Amino acid sequence: MGEKEEVKLLGVWYSPYAIRPKIALRLKSVDYDYVEENLFGSKSELLLKSNPVHKKVPVLLHNNKPIVESLNIVEYIDETWNSSAPSILPSHPYDRALARFWSDFVDNKWFPALRMAAITKSEDAKAKAMEEVEEGLLQLEDAFVSISKGKPFFGGEAIGFMDICFGSFVVLLKAREKFKAEKLLDESKTPSLCKWADRFLSDETVKNVAPEIEKVAEFLQELEVRAQSAASRS
């Protein structure tokens, strides 16, 4: 693409959303500078300037032009460095539509239920949210079997758009298993998805950018302690 370009990624180390562009950039062999934002402190001027609407990570800066929202960033990376490595999005329009549909399902239906189960104080609300989480995993199991057609990933032989989207939450699920003794990916219910998750975490691209499961589990415990402390003061 001619002269050397400036690529910078603003993120938070544990964020599933920040993992997504990291994977995409590595798949495309793009060199970039990473800037870690302070989760509990003041947001940087660069972040506030780059994403004034939502004021959150991740943000990709490409030659000082900001691109926001994690999956939007992944698509941008795929289209901008389209001569580097295979396409992240499927080549066929129908397959692209499926990948976007299931990615939207993960972000706007499945993960909100998981988040609700984690933060609600109501046992009834937690039970209802966990039902939605488990039902969603069954639906994703069926989607994987249908879309992968016996291949290792949603994207076929290699990690693709939907793998990046849902895979970004696998570390969080594994961390919850350690922190809460809560096994959501169950071999007896979602066998194909469980094998896919192991393959995803074992992929060299993912291993190089994903946070350590133990470290995330410790961080989740720290967050719970903070929440309990705040609740006791209110």
Swiss-Prot record:
The top EC class, named as a word, is transferase
Q: Which PROSITE patterns match?
A: GST_CTER (PS50405), GST_NTER (PS50404)
Q: Which residues bind glutathione?
A: S15, P16, S42, K43, K56, V57, E69, S70
Instruction: Select a single GO molecular function from the record's annotations and give it.
Output: glutathione transferase activity
Please name the source species: Arabidopsis thaliana
Against InterPro entries, the record matches this protein to: Glutathione-S-Trfase_C-like, Glutathione-S-Trfase_C_sf, Glutathione_S-Trfase_N, GST_C, GST_C_Tau, Omega/Tau-like, Thioredoxin-like_sf
What does its record list under induction? By the fungal pathogen Verticillium dahliae.
Gene3D superfamilies tied to this protein: 1.20.1050.10, Glutaredoxin (3.40.30.10)
Q: What is this protein called?
A: Glutathione S-transferase U16
Cell compartment(s), UniProt: Cytoplasm, Cytosol
> What Pfam families does the annotation carry?
GST_C, GST_N
Biological process according to GO = glutathione metabolic process; toxin catabolic process
The entry assigns this protein to a family as follows:
Belongs to the GST superfamily. Tau family.
Catalytic activity, EC: 2.5.1.18
Q: Which UniProt keywords apply?
A: Cytoplasm, Detoxification, Stress response, Transferase
Q: Which residues form the GST N-terminal domain?
A: 5-85
Catalytic activity, reaction form: RX + glutathione = an S-substituted glutathione + a halide anion + H(+)
Query: Major location, coarse class?
Result: cytoplasm
